[in-house]
């Protein structure tokens, strides 16, 4: 299961969500100020973390580019 921590209006969040949905991967999207606070986000991922952040089966992959790269390398998605 993929967990995406996003915020409204974030283009990288939208890109990552679009990729995951296009690939048909099971996921849940958590939205800042609806599902969690900024303090919760920094406590979970660290003060310097940016949006989005992705967790795959309990493993923190990181932001948009890191997550897509990992999923490509592991042949989970995005095979072009």
Please describe what each predicted stretch is:
Residues 31-48:
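Thioredoxin-like thiol-disulfide oxidoreductase module
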Residues 14, 18, 39, 69:
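Alpha-helical elements of the RecA-like P-loop NTPase motor core of helicases
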Residues 27-29, 60:
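Conserved beta-strand scaffold positions in the cores of enzyme catalytic domains, especially
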Residues 45-55, 64-65:
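Structural micro-motif
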Residues 56-80:
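Non-catalytic, surface beta->alpha helical segment in thiol-disulfide oxidoreductase systems
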Residues 11, 36, 62:
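Short alpha-helical
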Residues 1-27:
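Local sequence-structure signature of Cys/Sec-based thiol-disulfide redox active-site neighborhoods
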Residues 23, 44-45, 74:
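Residues at alpha-helix termini
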């Amino acid at each position: 299961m993929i967990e995406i921590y996003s915020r409204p209006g974030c283009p990288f969040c939208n890109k990552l969500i679009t990729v995951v949905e296009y690939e048909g991967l099971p996921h849940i999207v958590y939205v800042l100020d609806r599902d969690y606070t900024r303090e919760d986000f920094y406590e979970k991922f660290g003060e310097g973390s940016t949006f989005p952040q992705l967790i795959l089966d309990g493993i923190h992959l990181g932001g948009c580019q890191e997550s897509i790269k990992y999923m490509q390398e592991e042949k989970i998605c995005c095979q072009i």
